[in-house]
Amino acid sequence: MVPGVTLNLKGPSEKPVKLTIEPDREAAQEAIIKLVGGYNRLMADINILTRTDESLIGELDYLSDDEVKTAKQRLGILQGDSTLNLLRSSLQRTMAEPYETKDGSAMALAAQLGIATNARAPGAAGGYDKAKMRGYLEIEEDTLKKALVDHFEAAKQLFGNDTDGDLIVNSGLAYALDAALRPYVEKG
């Protein structure tokens, strides 16, 4: 057997069987959705701590009643904190930057996977949705699915890539997010 490969056997065959190994696009899509969900949760926490507008809590429809109560207590307690504001800016910049992949400019941005902040309000001529200007990301799932079919290897490299051939990831969105967050979560 091959490590990391799952065989889905359908039944016995009297003829030779041809095996095709395909990337698990569904697992990749789920991992990307989970990453974006975690990013949005972090942005929500930063927004709650650094802003006083209670309406932002109402926009977070996934919060339980207890979480809403806690969020209201924490609302704005670190308003003006430069550390959190720098972190928010750093994370937003990281999500918007291009990263080197085998497909070049055809797959260099998270937006090309369907991951972006879409601040335009639906149907509003030139209007913006205030809630979407808080740094949250959205996923256009059809774009994500198509990118994972057409550019799977480059999409993988977009998140983590060895650009100098030393077999160590040194570039990519996940790599950059880790580097941006590391100073805030390390001990000491």
Language-model-detected regions and their locations in the chain:
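Gly/Ser/Thr-rich loop/hinge elements
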Residues: 68-71
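Bacterial flagellar/type III secretion structural subunits and associated motility module proteins
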Residues: 1-46, 73-188
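Short, glycine/acidic-rich hinge or "gate" loops at secondary-structure transitions
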Residues: 49-63
